[in-house]
Amino acid sequence: FILAFRRSSRSCLILAFGYASFMMGTLYYLLHLIILGHGPQVFYVAECSWMASYFFFLSLEILYWEGLRPPFSPFALAAGVVIAGVVMRVQVFGPSPLMSGALALTFGTLAYLCFSALQKEKRLRPYEIALLFEMLLQILLFVVSEFIRDYTRFSLYYAVDILLTLTLVSFLPHILREEPHDLH
């Protein structure tokens, strides 16, 4: 937040809110695991925070397109539909069609915008690569969590979660490099 205000940067401020939202969901989930030894039984508390973070990451991508219209691309549309379909099939945020549908719509839109940028610029920006990788890791984390029941020892779940966190951290340097292009 301090960096966002020092630079008067909308993109840094949006990223800070995205980080804060993701951190709140993760903190709730981890405290529940540490204190009680199992995943939360009150569903969608952490998921709502994580969902808010993806809305902020979507806002960053929309900020990139501010004043421009993404070109229509059948490839980008297909990528968005496939990612949304995978999220719905795997039910990343649990059995609720509402939460899984909201995440599927958000991930599909993010994928569409990222691949539209690929069509426009003939390359993906580093932030978009990290964002697509982060979405893949979020899906993988849910799939892995279906097979892990013992959270007391280091497992594949924690390896994927650490990689997901490091990918989130990588957003900041990518955004700072694009700062001259930030429309503020």
Model features per residue range: what roles?
Residues 16-19, 26, 51, 104, ...:
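Generic intrinsically disordered, low-complexity segments enriched for polar/acidic and small residues
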Residues 81-119, 153-160:
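Extracellular-loop-to-transmembrane junctions of the mid-late helices
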Residues 1-8, 30-77, 114-115, 171-179:
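Internal transmembrane alpha-helix with an interfacial aromatic "cap," most often the third helix
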Residues 3-13, 37-44, 94-97, 122, ...:
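Juxtamembrane loop-transmembrane helix junctions in multi-pass integral membrane proteins
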Residues 17, 48-59, 77, 93-108:
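Hydrophobic, aromatic-enriched alpha-helical segments typical of multi-pass transmembrane helices
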